[in-house]
Amino acid sequence: MVRSFFTQRLLPAGYLFLLLFLGTSPWKTVAAQDDLLSLLDAEQAKEPSYTIATFKASRLINGQTIETISKNHLNFWISHRFGAVNSGFIANFFGLDEAKIRLGLEYGLTDRWLVGAGRSSLEKTYDLYTKYKVLRQSNTVPITVTAMAGWGINTMPTGYIMESGSPMKFNNNIERYSYWSQLLVARKFNEKLSLQLMPTLIHVNKVEDPSIPNQLFSLGAGGRYKLSQRITLSAEYYYTLRELEDEDDDDDYDANGGIPYPYRNALSFGVDIETGGHVFQFHLTNARGMVEKQFIGQNVGSWGKGDIFYGFNIARTFSLDKAARNSHK
């Protein structure tokens, strides 16, 4: 009885006296706890929640996306562009006999910074580039911004015939160089739709005719729409800010006459299929080049004339992170 009286009567009374002595009350204590929880919720709301998988790969179709790759991971790219479908069935089997290929590697120095290199059979071009994710979309930042810079060298013998039909003669190796830089700006609107802008500056040390500028600016736009968990539709378009020849003008290019070659804006459509560590990209495009200098600055294909090239990209990701591999054992 004494113990029951002590626990049921004296302890609660003592607790109430202590609260009154401290100048508070049980109700104030509960209110203080609620205020503390509210402050914690507010602090958590301020912490950024980053958007992931704006795009499934570091390339959209021909061009780059804002995506980088994880630290100590390696991407291996295989890209094919076949000949134009208007090249005929008997002569080239609708372009299958005129395939161009690019092999490329990308390595993640950090989760936001990668370096890449590749070799394209078109003009036997070697390219190097780097990308850095400057801003990441989150609950406080509406967009992702990635900066990219690249360099390429044309290793064809001097005097070769370009895609434009004109000869290209190099006086030294410096004339073989080209450079490009991009600011990739994208937003993931929801789980299905992502859009991207790609302002691009390209400089080519040697062009085939004085009427063609060494430097050009292009504004690209692209996006993707997810049909399912693994299948995505994609598109991209690069508008080059310089005078283009009329699509209906069939005059041949005359390098010596100063007539600017009818370089075209690149327009591409694709379907992406993701299967585990692989990404398969199938597309139709009027650009056969796979380096920025080629598919933006020197694109000769015209959708209106049937210069449509079909091709594909295959990307395979490998983890070189020993700690991550050991954690899965």
Residue ranges, per PLM feature:
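Intrinsically disordered, low-complexity segments enriched in Ser/Pro/Gly/Ala and basic residues
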Residues: 3-4, 24, 185
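Sec/Tat signal peptide C-region and signal peptidase I cleavage site
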Residues: 26-32
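N-terminal secretory signal peptides that target proteins for export/translocation
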Residues: 1-9
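Bacterial N-terminal signal peptides
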Residues: 13-25
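Transmembrane beta-barrel domains of Gram-negative outer membranes and organellar outer membranes
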Residues: 33-171, 176-181, 187-197, 201-205, ...
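A contiguous binding-surface segment within folded domains or other stable secondary-structure elements
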Residues: 209-247
